[in-house]
Amino acid sequence: MNEIELRLARLRELMKREHLSAFIFPSTDAHQSEYVADHWRGREWISGFNGSAGTAVVTMKSAALWTDSRYFLAAEEQLEGTEYQLMRLKMEGTPTIVEWLGKELQNVQSPEVGLDGIVNSYNYVKDLIYSLRKLGGITLRTNLDPLEQIWENRPSLPANPVEIQPLEYAGETLASKVARIRKSLRELHADGMLVSALDDIAWALNLRGTDVHCNPVFVSYLLIESDKVSLFVDDNKLSPEVKQYLQDNQVSLYNYNKVEKCLESYSEYNILLDGDETSYYLWKAVKCQEIVAAGSPIPAMKAVKNKAEIEGYRSAMLKDGVAMVKFLKWLKPAVEAGGQTEISIDEKLTSLRAEQKLFRDISFDTIAGYAQHGAIVHYEATPETDVVLKPEGLILIDSGAQYQDGTTDITRTIALGAVSEEMKHIYTLVLKAHIQLELVKFPDGASGTQLDAVGRECMWREGYNFLHGTGHGVGSYLCVHEGPHQIRMEWMPTPLRAGMTLTDEPGLYLAGKFGVRIENTVLISDYMSTEFGKFLQIEPLTLCPIDTTPIDVDMLLPEEIDWLNAYHHSVYEKLSPFLDEEEKIWLENATKPIK
């Protein structure tokens, strides 16, 4: 038996004792986070799949894992040798979890499915209960966490220190943010609100932590009432300075595990709960007269950056650009010298970023995919998959950093030597899509779905497409993936506004061959106002040359060439003062105009 088989055997022994026919393991934590602390990586532990999105379902005789297109190839590799069947979300013929359970349990008498109500959202569980009932006879149990019994040496909840995010970077005081939140609550006719999302809590309180790898958040809950603010957090995370700061801002402190009791005794008439962010367990604990089921107002506030945050991004992008130039100057000669691998170049890039002021961490695990690994959208090199780089072909490097004044996210695909005509064609198509999105002008309030088509159109014309989103929001020294605004094919109702930060990251992936992605972090800013309304534009924040060697210039429109040359001129002008002479010469060559 391999390790996954042993874990499944232990789980099934427990399921048998508990009279459960199946158990569902999500990728989330008690706060519905995308990236979670080690304590909550239960889906990874039970399946072996380490992607940030996916759901594992285990019955007494079978197991399956659902994930999205970013992870199809990675999941295929990681699930190999296990009994897990890979379910490719949104692909024709892929059953839903409920459909699969209906088939797997059709001959089971009085089947009961289990899940942990603490790590599943209220809306998810509510919909699941309804769907299982429609199948007939399948019930759902929500009060069991099997990992507490079968996961030996399970990591404990993190207890890392919390720090204050200075006002010079936050740009708005805690008191001002709470006042804005309370105003929104009054408009929603709510007396209070439970905040579960960790990045929303960090933003509202101007605090940061290190409880989650790459994400500067801390495990906690926040209760905002009309006359009181309560933070539920382990006391040992808070220094005397942080406690005094919270006291000065009239924030009461309670232990993290007291939130349930507080909700049970909540005295206001009603409370706002976001069903996508609040766990089923805590929702059911609320005993007040009325629950206002509505989306949290915080993400929309957090999405529009203030002047200090925007200046912080610009500063962070300068530092990150300097690190990237040093890295790219080093890369090709190092590969030609031999011995460099996907992992070793990742370590080099991180070390160069760490030399920059205000560097705190990387913002996600670097994706450095050489040759066919570049076609795995969210590839992460391991000692088992790591390969030596050769002075030929393409390498896709998607990386980012957390600086105290801003978060960065950048992808560059680099030609390490000779490239094929097919590589040039695909590379140039991706570049065209990237540029077209950055050229677009659009009405204030347009949706990300409308913009998505602008970037993809040149690919669609040739029958190409990519299945991930074109862009996601980016936090301000917070999570690198931030909502509610996105640019993607699926309908995104959130209106785009000036001050929002996003990524522009189209890509094309040829399985078994190579992948190309080009990504800038961008800012939505004012363009003009006319009798027809206010119009917005996209401004690149990322400062780093785009490799011009794999470009088929004949494929580019004049306006695309003009954009690239203007962008490269800006990159050189802004970065060169921070480089030595050799680096300046390299950057000048990397940013010289194309014709």
Task: Label each residue range with its predicted role.
Residues M1-K595:
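Active-site neighborhoods and metal-handling regions in enzymes and metal-associated proteins
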